[in-house]
UniProtKB/Swiss-Prot annotation:
This is Chaperone protein HtpG. It holds the Pfam family HATPase_c_3. GO terms for cellular component: cytoplasm. It comes from Bacillus licheniformis (strain ATCC 14580 / DSM 13 / JCM 2505 / CCUG 7422 / NBRC 12200 / NCIMB 9375 / NCTC 10341 / NRRL NRS-1264 / Gibson 46). InterPro entries: HATPase_C_sf, Heat_shock_protein_90_CS, HSP90_C, Hsp90_fam, Hsp90_N, Ribosomal_Su5_D2-typ_SF. SUPFAM superfamilies: ATPase domain of HSP90 chaperone/DNA topoisomerase II/histidine kinase, HSP90 C-terminal domain, Ribosomal protein S5 domain 2-like. It is found in: Cytoplasm. PANTHER family: HEAT SHOCK PROTEIN 90 FAMILY MEMBER. Molecular chaperone. Has ATPase activity.
Amino acid sequence: MAKREFKAESKRLLDIMINSIYSQKEVFLRELISNASDAIDKIYYKALTDDSLTFNKDDYYIKISADKENRTLTIADTGIGMTKEELEEHLGTIAKSGSLAFKQENELKDGHDIIGQFGVGFYAAFMVADTVTVITKAHGSDEAHQWESAGADGYTIEPAAKESAGTDVILKLKENTDDENYDEYLDVHRLKAIIKTYSDFIRYPIKMDVAVNKPKEGAENEFEEVQEEQTVNSMVPIWRKNKSELKDEDYEAFYKEKHYGFDKPLAHIHTSVDGAVRYHAILFIPENIPFNYYTKEFEKGLELYSNGVLIMEKCPDLLPDHFSFVKGMVDSEDLSLNISREMLQHDRQLKLIAKNISKKIKNELKSLLKNDREKYESFYQSFGRQLKFGVYNDFGAHKDLLKDLLLFYSSKEKKLVTLEEYVSRMPEDQKYIYYASGDSYDRIEKLPQTELVSEKGYEILYFTEDIDEFAIKMLANYQEKEFKSVSSGDLGIENDDEQNQSDGDDSQYKDLFEEMKKTLDGKVKSVRASKRLKTHSVCLAADGEVTIEMEKILNAMPDNQHVKADKVLEINTNHEVFKTLQNAFDNDKDKFKLYTGLLYNQALLIEGLPIEDPVEFTNDICKVMA
């Protein structure tokens, strides 16, 4: 029995197979099970065109057996088997794929899928085994053969005894090292876990002998441990079943089984597409926010299967960031995988799937918003922030997709409203969509800047999250209505009498306002008579794109860039305080400076901005009270 050399550059190539292609050793089992599944598939496909062949699915299965005493692991199948020539051709040549050749020779039509295509998966066995033995008997043949190899040095082929057609792959596991515990691949529970992770949806039964406790025959209340053959994989994935066959409870059970979350899913999406790219997907919108969702540790992504075999536990490219909260899986026959089947080549199919999934998620959320507002608002409390980030990120690339999903608190209804709801009830004379920003609903409601807009009967959106104003700035408008902060210099509210009066005030008190600006020494861009204040004495407004709320948020970030809004101090010239200020301007310059500082600090406090010198501020209050 002469040892034969591999037909490829064996030592170098096999070394790459063992040490470089696969990131995790446990995937060897996935590869060998996939090969076994392919071997059974080949009989099935031949039976489709050969009337002399019959295919009874009950006769075909994969058996995994662990022998702890001899440190061997066997993966056996009842598939098509191999002849001596096929052993030589497929196992004697690294990267020669028998499955790919079978596909090409038989011109399999869409829907008839064999997993293997690279011809390297078998050699993953050498990651965990010193010696690999293959005993095989081809379907319809009377002869069996044994292929054996200890690695790159070569292999042997010799006659063997085997009763039925199929293939047994026997791994003599490596000895344990300080870094690797190869004994784990002899543990039934560990093997079941690997199968559940990667190969749960292989279409044929994967059987194992499992120890179970059963009542001892002839003895009352006594049990004995016996070996029982069990099928350890699910075989038919839920996503390939008709939706009409499934209930909400089935989806919830799948959600829990896959450990997508401890909560119940708020909604699910089950879709099957057979177009430019074929895929099945089950997606879940969770009820509660994951504890680490807004941390660096959170990883977005969907489980990705190719033909029922898990390829990636989290494929980030299938979800945009704004839908990163979605859990679930995708199974496709059309993916371009790399040689290890662990990563994807970034191709057109993947992008198409991701695009379609994004639309499905958006439509589901829109449907939830329309048909179950309470449930949608519950979702929005958890993940609305992420939708707003989606509007803002990537220079607004996704704003049109997301804008109808946004909710904001309203001054009129004191509840969350959509932009469409707001615009639909705008009076004809209202030019803008008005908003106010602050830490909470109650605090915004008390802002002096809201007085004029509220008096006109216009609705105000209350922005209570730091991302709100940035998202709206990126959105710019909705249904051709621009957004306008109640703190903006020009509110676009026409009032001829008030306009004339205000203009007169600015002219009449020009010197006073100039002196106030001088006293504040660059802290404000200007001082002017307010058109918006009714009962309050003073407020801050902002000219330009950066609002006061944006200044607060940007300067609170770790990379504080000391952003400054163009602040304008607005004075209510009809307020009693202004008369006191005017009297001081005419008669007591020191008091005038004192009052100016107090009014400015009062405006800062209203906005939630820090006072530069709290001690000086309290001393000034004492001077006024003394």
